[in-house]
Design a protein with these regions (language model features):
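Active-site gating loops and adjacent loop-to-helix segments of metal-dependent hydrolytic enzymes
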Residues: 13-57, 183-201, 240-258
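Catalytic metal-binding/acid-base residues of hydrolase active sites
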Residues: 13, 150-151, 180-181, 230, ...
């Protein structure tokens, strides 16, 4: 490709093994964080709630990640925490401390491999503390944060989140919006529909609310990136516009805020990627994999290279757009430190 900054995968997850093992061994303690061994891995539970699924090897094994990056011809990878361990269930103070511990652990592991770019976390259940955490991050090293679609029982368009959005706007921070499984009613219990559809519904509803509330347009300094190609949003935007025209006094123009969004390429189908590029613009789409999960695109360059797009647009998606959005953090990487050989397959 022609882009000097190489190929950048902006959508990948990690669970810092050092922090997890320290918690399991009692070397690090949080009152409401419970880490236990299960099926040769670990689970994490918050505030007495149900445990997560066992941590996938690809989340914790740096050797697997390093080998995969080389195999796929990916120069840099933006790594974010696994949403299941963000700890939004925790009390505000403990949640703030947990967010710091998780962000520092992510930053430490990326420092050991110059190809990795960290995104932090914030205690989104307390918007004031989330704003403070965003301001306190080392900007040159951590260009932004990943957040879920809701926290503390509130939607992201709730006025309570104003301090967070103001902080993101002022800091020019990347805010990567990632769904959970909050939309997974019993209707999604079969056929793998939690991953196949519920997460996309979660994103789409959150985005529709943000657009109608005018949040992206009101805070243009916040670089809002959306996972999984924006869910269904690009396809239903016309309907949202029609709904706005019926009630223009009660909703902001969704097109104005849609134009502020950035998207990853995790859509799998070249025709869908072509539609996304046509709808959002070639400067608004970036390569993503959702590594290490099977529902992700673990050969992410393929969909870009198969899409009927000009080579200039492919180059933008494969690296140019991300290099611009992530700024100095996406500069040419230093050589990675030696890694152990891969010990297994990445699996969710």
């Amino acid at each position: 490709m022609s882009e000097p900054d190489g190929v950048l995968d902006i959508h990948a997850h990690v669970a810092p093994a050092g922090l997890i093992t320290d918690l399991a061994a009692g070397r690090v303690r949080f009152l409401h964080v419970d880490v236990r061994r299960r099926d040769g891995s670990y689970t994490v539970a918050f505030r007495g709630g149900p445990p997560t699924r066992p941590l996938a090897a690809g989340l914790t094994d740096p050797g697997l990640r390093a080998a995969w990056l080389t195999e796929q011809g990916i120069t840099r990878q933006v790594v974010s925490g696994w949403l299941d361990i963000f700890g939004y269930e925790l009390p505000a103070g403990e949640g703030a401390d947990w967010s710091v511990a998780l962000t520092e652990a992510i930053a430490a592991l990326t420092a050991a491999d110059g190809r990795l770019i960290p995104l932090g976390t914030v205690p989104l259940q307390d918007p004031e503390r989330a704003a403070a955490a965003l301001h306190q991050r080392p900007v040159a090293q951590i260009p932004g944060v990943m957040i879920g679609t809701r926290a503390g029982g509130r939607e992201l368009d709730d006025p309570a989140f104003t301090p967070f959005w103001e902080a993101a706007d002022a800091a020019g921070a990347v805010v990567y919006l990632h769904p959970g499984s909050a939309g997974a009613t019993p209707r999604y219990a079969d056929f793998g529909l939690v991953n196949g559809l519920a997460r996309l519904e979660d994103s789409t509803v959150t985005l529709a609310r943000l657009l109608y509330a005018g949040v992206p347009a009101r805070y243009p300094g916040a670089k809002l990136v959306v996972a999984h190609g924006g869910g269904a949003l690009p396809y239903v935007l016309g309907r949202l516009v029609r709904n706005h025209l019926i009630d223009p006094g009660g909703t902001a123009d969704p097109v104005e805020s849609f134009a502020r969004l950035h998207f990853d390429s995790v859509v799998f189908d070249p025709a869908v990627l072509e539609f996304l590029v046509a709808k959002a613009g070639p400067d608004r789409v970036m390569l993503g994999s959702d590594y290490p999960f099977p529902i992700g695109d673990l050969a992410p360059r393929s969909v870009v290279e198969r899409a009927a797009l000009p080579q200039e647009h492919r180059d933008q998606i494969l690296g140019g757009n991300a290099a611009r959005l992530f700024g100095s953090a996406a500069a040419a990487p230093s050589p990675p430190m030696p890694r152990p050989a891969p010990s297994g397959e990445a699996a969710r």
